[in-house]
Amino acid sequence: GFNAVTSVSEEWALNYSKESHPDRKTRYQIADEFLDVVTGLWENRELRFDPDGIRRFYADPINHQGKNYQVLGPLNVAPSPQGRPLIAQAGGSGPGIKVAAKHAE
């Protein structure tokens, strides 16, 4: 699974090239965009059989241009048997619940 955590401390934020810890609303806006990107990458690839019977990997660019991320894609890793990991998000604030409702299983 994939646990989408927006971090709780200044020290953790510094691990991701941030000069300071964003406020809660901003963290969840960033998380929402990140989850859009990563699920787009996960869901935009497949293994399928060509007409010649050979199983091949296919993936298309996602061309994401957002406020926080610019990702052309595609993800260059074949999908796992389940396609993508289960997404968990345990935020209890209003913004956290909104992100969980949109992205988490």
Give each language-model segment a name.
Residues F2-H103:
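Internal, glycine-rich beta/alpha segment that forms the wall or movable "lid"
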